[in-house]
Amino acid sequence: MRILILLLAVTQLAVSSPVITRCFHGGQLIAERKSQTSISEFCIKDDVSMLKSEIVYTKNDTGIFGHSKVFRHWTITDWKACNPVVTAGGSINVIEVDKNLNLVTRNYVCTGDCTITVDRKNAQIIFQTDKLNHFEVTGTTISTGWFKSKASVTLDRTCEHIKVSCGKKTLQFHACFKQHMSCVRFLHRSILPGSMAISICQNIELIIITILALCIFIIMIILTKTYICYVLIPVFMPIAFAYGWAYNRSCKKCTCCGLAYHPFTNCGSYCVCGSKFETSDRMRMHRESGLCQGFKSLRVARRLCKSKGSSLIISILLSVLILSFVTPIEGTLTNYPTDQKYTLDEIADVLQAKTHEDSTKYYIILYTSLFGAGLTIIFAGVALGLTIILEVLTKINVIFCNECNMYHSKKSIKYVGDFTNKCGFCTCGLLEDPEGVVVHKAKKSCTYSYQINWVRGIMIFVAFLFVIQNTIIMVAAEEDCWKNEELKEDCVGPLIAPKDCTDKDHKTYLSEASLLATAKKITQVDAENVEILGKTMESAIRVIERQKTYHRMHLLEAVFLNKHCDYYKMFEHNSGYSQVKWRMMIKTQHFDICALQANSPFCAQCIADNSCAQGSWEFDTHMNSTYSSKVDNFKHDFSLFLRIFEAAFPGTAYVHLLTNIKEKKPYQAVSMIEKIKKKFPNNKLLIGYLDFGKYLLGLSHASTYELQQRQLDKLYQPTELTRSGGQQTSLANSVVGQATKECKKYKDVSCLSPRFGIPLEDLISCCDQPNYNIYKKPKKVYKAHDKEETWCINDQHCLVDFVPAEADTVEKLKPMKCWLVDPGKNDDVYSIAIKTCRVVDKGVCTVNSQKWNIIKCDSGPLYYSDHIPGEDTGNDIGHYCVSAGCKTDRYPINPDVVTDCVWEFTSRKSQYIGKISMQSLEDYEKALTDRLTHTLETYSFAPLENLPHIKPVYKYITAQGVENSDGIEGAFITASIPAAGGTSIGYNVRSKDGFPLLDLIVFVKSAVIKSTYNHIYDTGPTISINTKHDEHCTGQCPSNIEHEANWLTFSQERTSRWGCEEFGCLAVNTGCVFGSCQDVIRPETKVYRKAVDEVVILTVCITYPGHTFCTEINAIEPKITEEIELQFKTVDTKTLPYIVAVNNHKLYSGQINDLGTFGQMCGNVQKTNSSILGTGTPKFDYTCHGASRKDIIVRRCYNNNFDSCKLLKEETQLIFNDDHDTITVYNTNHLIGELAIKLILGDIQYKLFTETLDLQIDAKCVGCPDCFESYSCNFQIVSNIDTICSLEGPCDTFHNRISIKAMQQNYAVKLSCQKDPRPSGTFKICNREYTVVFHTVAKDDKIEINVGDQTSFIKEKDDRCKTWLCRVRDEGISVIFEPIKAFFGSYFSIFFYIIVVVVVGFLIIYIFMPMFMKLKEVLKANEKLYLQEIKQK
């Protein structure tokens, strides 16, 4: 009883305990399958869910089966709310399961509407949506996440090259701050607030130079406490000497001590010579008595070495000197004859090609040398000979009448005494003038019409001779062969070959067959098939030998010999390309009889040395006895003879020989051999070989010789011209069909030519007899799903027209034997209807000029759909109904009829920042005042958009041209500029006499080296492994393990043992576990390969006040226009990497596998479309279970070195436009070279200009102080004369000279203002002042946005100011006092002026007053001397 209670308690405990499951509990079943091959268990996570597999094994009479199930658990529960679709390059990675339970990774995007904006003031990217959506930011800043209303990402790098994705939108842009942000990021991570960090970093150079000066000063103070400080004596000695020299000559002496005047201090104890005195009187006496040795410079130098003031000065100078040669931290950029063997079949073609090549080269040289002389001789001979011949021929038609001095036609002429009935009428058309006013003079031109007729007739006759020449030659010897129904010995190839061979190189198989068709020997259908002979003699001979009927073989052989008309003509000699094969066989393969009867004359001369000089042979009785006793030797020699004969005479001759042997009448072939011998009597080796063949054919063994199967295949197999299926029907009344999309009673038409059996197919018939409509046969036809006895092309919707047959084709088939065959049924995707599918794309397409709603399923087909967006079947994510409510079956539409599709779900393509140029300043002001900081466009004032952000440094340049009394005619300037993006130079153009003419700015807007790359594959880390495995209880592993394409196989034997066997398996140390595997990767990195070579493009802009233009130039050719001439003086291009990788919108280069290569480096697992490629040796393990199948654990399948991708070099100097399928890579930071510029200025009549005049000016300026845009001004200037004037403004103007023309009124000027010019400012134009209204827009943009191919403000600033000292100069000392002044206001000015007064007073009292007093004493001394001189006089 106690045992029973215990068992019940254990059972209850087991029932109440929850079942422990792997990975997660529950989940949605998305796929299952029963199969003898099982998958491995897995637990894997993607961006929106987790997946796991479960396998349960069952056994029945047919074997052990695994029931595999795959479950999904959603981690983003409402992920479907974003309406996801599969999109290449999508930001959401989802793992799906196909019908074979293989894991497949796909990229999705949400299709919900998402708005992407850029807040330039706060340097943020803002995303807004109405429902669940997903965003991703990649590039220099990386961020991703889900949101339902609003999200933002802050930018904090100096220059951001990023790709922003949200929903279906993808935006790519380049954003740069006004200052470098590395310092701000470093300080902002500390306790400092953001505003303070920005203020510190704006003046970082000044702060650092101050800190460096203090550090050096502290070190100097420490050194002054030691003797080391005296190493500076050489530095201070020149200063001390100069001070001593000035001390003795420039300073007034104190009346008490004799030293330099010191009004505010007591007299000292030390003299300048170093002596010490107790009282000032003794020192004065020492000075006045001349005992003082003078100023001691070394003593002063030693004091300076110990002085703190000198240490401070040296520290400041050293810090300035050091940092003047150092690039600012903010501006630094961190960079991290063939040897070939031929077969005997190919050697004829190779030899002929070599011979033809050598002959061609010889004749080219020969004809080129004789061309000039030959033309002269030919033309002279033709001119002379043609004239004589035409005169003779003309006399046949025309006579010259001496009575009337005219030419008369002989036709219908009658003589009347010495006159004719045509006297008075000449062949030239002139009548005799009865009055004698016009006197006809006989000329040769009177007979020109007859001469022209004769020339026309001669040309037609010559052309006719050329046409019939080959026809006569070709058909003369073959007159009877075309009529034969079987092969005769007179019609074999060597005997019907042309005797003459001309114009061989211009002959083609088709042209020769056309001549036969013209001669009515064959039909045109036969002639059109001769191109099956191919392009080489080897292929042609093989095609001829494969023919199974005499007519076909004879036809092809005749065409072949007519084209290669010298093929058998070479047999008249002892060499030639057509004899190489059989001669090589004789040389390399020997008859057995010659080994047994080596002394035989035939063997000694023909076989041993290939001379065969004797010419006739008698085969002795020794050969007879040998062959009679040794049948095997006869079979060998006879077989070798046949092979050599086939190599020498392929085609009909060889078939004729084999036919006689097969019919046991080999002796009947002797007459054919005799005729061949007579045709080629000079070919000694051939004669000897044929004589030996005659001898073999005459032996008794030849009648019993059995042909081999290969030889039997060469024989003809005549068959009746018929077809295996279909009904024979006469198509004599058939007609060409009319264009139609539906074919009633469709039948396939198959015809044979009546004589040679050449098939005429690829035709169909529609309608009933006898007037069949004939059409060209389409590739595939389908029976319409909604109409009886109606057939359609390509699909079941009848959307494509049947193409009518050609009229001449219909005429050809009328005399032929034809059969009508019922069409076969096409069981493919176009005959299968569906209700649901996984939709890839949905949109509107044009189908036969009509707009249809089309969807594209993941299996590939297109369907017409009235699908309601968002209607999901619920099976799994991505499955949608094809028809509304899944009520109607739909058949696929062939994509050939679908055009102009506008897909709603497209692959992700990047958008770029738009550029809008405003022609009107009012429109530009509106764009700025509307605070369009969140828009994805940039606005610019068109006349000034080609200027740099920062005013360039101006240089003086002299205008060249022709000087005249008014100025310069055809003025121009020449200069050179570095070909680097962002480079700008201003030019003050002056005349040769120094008169300022105008200002212009040359700006290299962009200088790029670019190339296009194509996407070749994706790679990434392995996140799972697809496996399929099976096991055998006993036996060995299969030699060939079945596996899918691109899967690797694995196996292990002796896996069955006690406690480790499947159901019903009792085995030890035997059995096998085997299977296949494939990696599943997360496609994180895209790999691209260069498609085109690099292109260098330079955009140069020229801007005058009132006129601007840009032009592009490449590195290959100069650019010349009416306004400018550009040419590269030097070019230094840079090669872009051949293969690059893109990960998180960053570009990498290095050791990357190309498509199809799998080295141990980045990219050795490659995903292309839906295929995964890779190599490796799988490593697997298994876990044993008693009476159950083993669990297979695949630890590695492919060799995946994705970690090496993380070690690739990031190409920070390169930017790119990413469109997924292609990328365009730009190098915008390379100095391409030096560019020479010539600007055409036109005529400048500056000597007639006036500098001072009154103008009617209406002006307005719009902009913001200390911002990216600065101020843009538009001047409406009305003037009656042309002049050039100076231009000054309240801020720094980009142009200081303006050319005013009477025919132009609009002028644009850009100003750079650090402060607000207030409501109005004063411009000075032509020495007259004008008040201009300023419209200041309150803007505090922190970032500047563009597409990245043009230079930014920060880059121009770095290029302009490349040292610390330059930055300190630009920042100025005033930045230290700016915060104080802003706090105290006007009181700070009062304090500042007091400090200035104190400093100036100090300088006057201690420096200038002693010097003035000394000057006063010198003047008084001179006055005393003057008075003394007067008294003495």
Swiss-Prot record:
Swiss-Prot/TrEMBL site (Cleavage) positions: A477, E478
Q: Which domain of life is it from?
A: Viruses
Q: Does the keyword Nuclease apply?
A: no
Query: What spans does the record annotate as topological domain Cytoplasmic, numbered to this chain?
Result: 225-308, 391-456, 1409-1433
Task: Give the transmembrane ranges.
Answer: 204-224, 309-329, 370-390, 457-477, 1388-1408
Signal peptide (from-to): 1-16
Gene Ontology cellular-component terms for this entry are: host cell endoplasmic reticulum membrane; host cell Golgi membrane; membrane; virion membrane
Glycosylation site residues:
N60, N624, N1169
The record, for Pfam families, names: Bunya_G1 (PF03557), Bunya_G2 (PF03563)
Q: Spell out the post-translational modification annotation for this entry.
A: Specific enzymatic cleavages in vivo yield mature proteins including nonstructural protein NSm, Glycoprotein C, and Glycoprotein N.
Identify the residue ranges that face the Lumenal compartment according to the record: 17-203, 330-369, 478-1387
Q: Which UniProt keywords apply?
A: Fusion of virus membrane with host endosomal membrane, Fusion of virus membrane with host membrane, Glycoprotein, Host endoplasmic reticulum, Host Golgi apparatus, Host membrane, Host-virus interaction, Membrane, Signal, Transmembrane, Transmembrane helix, Viral attachment to host cell, Viral penetration into host cytoplasm, Virion, Virus entry into host cell
State the InterPro entries in the record. Bunya_G1, Bunya_G2, Bunya_nonstruc_pro_NSm, M_poly_OrthobunV
| GO BP annotation list | fusion of virus membrane with host endosome membrane; symbiont entry into host cell; symbiont-mediated perturbation of host process; virion attachment to host cell
What the protein does comes down to:
Glycoprotein N and Glycoprotein C interact with each other and are present at the surface of the virion. They are able to attach the virion to a cell receptor and to promote fusion of membranes after endocytosis of the virion.
Q: What protein family does this chain belong to?
A: Belongs to the orthobunyavirus envelope glycoprotein family.
Q: How does it assemble?
A: Glycoprotein N and Glycoprotein C interact with each other.
Q: What is this protein called?
A: Envelopment polyprotein
Q: Origin organism of this chain?
A: Bunyamwera virus
Q: What is the lineage of its organism?
A: Viruses, Riboviria, Orthornavirae, Negarnaviricota, Polyploviricotina
